[in-house]
């Protein structure tokens, strides 16, 4: 996010899940933009590389709160343990995924930081947005871990 955006009030939501597979299997799902609609509940379609790199732009369509919107994700960082994106889909969000080994499994963490809406209506919208982002994030991580587990051939464990 730009400096002027980071000076405004923002809020953060986070979630984590354990995947019963090695981290590299989860990372492959994260970095393949064509797979995002399979595990991110709001994403309908994407156009982007099979393995994103810093500087890539992934464009797509999403369904947010009943509205179809065009969006894009600018890939900011691709460390060995995850992905950092600047996402613009109705609102701007900095989305970070980190995957770390946990024995034979993987701990997958996701964090979303977004600008808080302002004004009286903004407070109501902010409340609804936080709830939606938390739910969306939990669903995304549930789906991501299940897909990674299925890809690795391990048994899928319900959360």
Which ranges hold each PLM region?
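Hydrophobic ligand-binding cavity/cleft-lining segments
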Residues: 1-53, 146, 159
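Short beta-strand segments that buttress and anchor functional surface loops
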Residues: 4, 57-63, 83-89
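Short, surface-exposed coil-to-beta transition loops
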Residues: 12-14, 68-72, 92-96, 107
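A short, structured loop/turn motif at beta-sheet edges
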Residues: 20-24, 51-54, 77-81, 98-107
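Beta-strand elements of well-folded, non-transmembrane domains
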Residues: 21, 64-66, 114-118
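Hydrophobic pocket/interface hotspot
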Residues: 25-30, 36, 58-60, 75, ...
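Helix-adjacent hinge/juxtasegments
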Residues: 64-78, 85-86
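Beta-strand/loop substructures that line and gate deep hydrophobic ligand-binding cavities in soluble
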Residues: 87-139, 155-157
């Amino acid at each position: 996010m730009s400096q002027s955006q980071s000076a405004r009030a923002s809020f953060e939501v986070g979630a984590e899940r354990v995947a019963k597979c090695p981290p590299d299997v989860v990372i492959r799902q994260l970095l393949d933009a064509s797979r995002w609609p399979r595990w991110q509940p709001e994403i309908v379609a994407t156009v982007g590389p099979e393995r994103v790199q810093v500087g890539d732009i992934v464009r797509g369509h999403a369904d947010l709160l009943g509205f179809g919107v065009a969006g894009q994700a600018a890939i900011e960082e691709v460390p060995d343990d995850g992905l950092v994106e600047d996402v613009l889909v109705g609102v701007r969000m900095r989305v970070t995924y980190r995957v770390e080994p946990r024995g034979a499994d993987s701990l997958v963490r996701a964090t979303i930081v977004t600008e808080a809406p302002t004004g009286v209506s903004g407070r109501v919208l902010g409340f609804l947005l936080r709830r939606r982002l938390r739910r969306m994030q939990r669903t995304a991580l549930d789906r991501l871990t299940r897909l990674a587990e299925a890809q690795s051939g391990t048994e899928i464990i319900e959360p």
